[in-house]
Amino acid sequence: METYVNKLHEGSIYTAAVQYNVIEKDDDPASLTIWVPMFQSSISADMLIKELINVNILVRQISTPKGPSLKIMINSRSAVLAQMPSKFTISANVSLDERSKLAYDITTPCEIKACSLTCLKVKNMLTTVKDLTMKTFNPTHEIIALCEFENIMTSKRVVIPTFLRSINVKAKDLDSLENIATTEFKNAITNAKIIPYAGLVLVITVTDNKGAFKYIKPQSQFIVDLGAYLEKESIYYVTTNWKHTATKFSIKPIED
């Protein structure tokens, strides 16, 4: 079994982002990715990861208004995992590598192949794209972060465009948009890191919360869902070998 610990926060209390790679225990097993709803923990990461791999996982495919889903049940006798959600539902479209192999409405035990734990900042220091978009009244433009990574094994570079948030820009300020992108955002981001969670997510640390980032607390972490963007790459390979080198910004008008 493989285990990975990504420490993006060193505090005594942190938010745990846990992802399992599992395989069904049956004659025609399906491979699944399971991510646990984030939870707060004060247990050391090294101790927590040891308990995370000693759980029993049951999976059942169900139908929901949001599409095919998986009902997950995690059983553990460890008090260390008392804060971790034990029953939850995730998207089958993101989770399943081979959905045709998973039976409908049958509870199946799974074997853990890999477990990843990422330590993030506490809940009130985390922000998502959804959080910011909901706070924008009559949005006119979108802010796109062009995050550049270098593969340290091959020296090749890749740029991942990520939607950050929508903003409202008045007509009189349109001419200054280019200046905003080069000055206001210049020092906003100190680093970006790809971690395994719900597939893959990008964690951006924001240092300057002026202007377009005014709803984000300084030094908070901004979580961007990459979904299946890198589904053909090994999660372990990407998280280990991709180094963030730069971030540029683009401000685009919202298209009808």
Curated annotation (Swiss-Prot):
Location in the cell: Virion; Host cytoplasm; Host nucleus; Host cell membrane
One GO term describing the cellular component: viral envelope
Region (Nuclear targeting and binding to host importin KPNB1): 110-183
PTM info: Phosphorylation is important for oligomerization.
Effect on the protein of changing P65L: In strain: ATCC 51908
Function field: Plays a crucial role in virus assembly into filaments and budding. Early in infection, localizes in the nucleus where it may inhibit host cell transcription. Later in infection, traffics to the cytoplasm through the action of host CRM1 to associate with inclusion bodies, the site of viral transcription and replication. During virus assembly and budding, acts as a bridge between the nucleocapsid and the lipid bilayer.
Record's protein name: Matrix protein
This protein's encoding gene: M
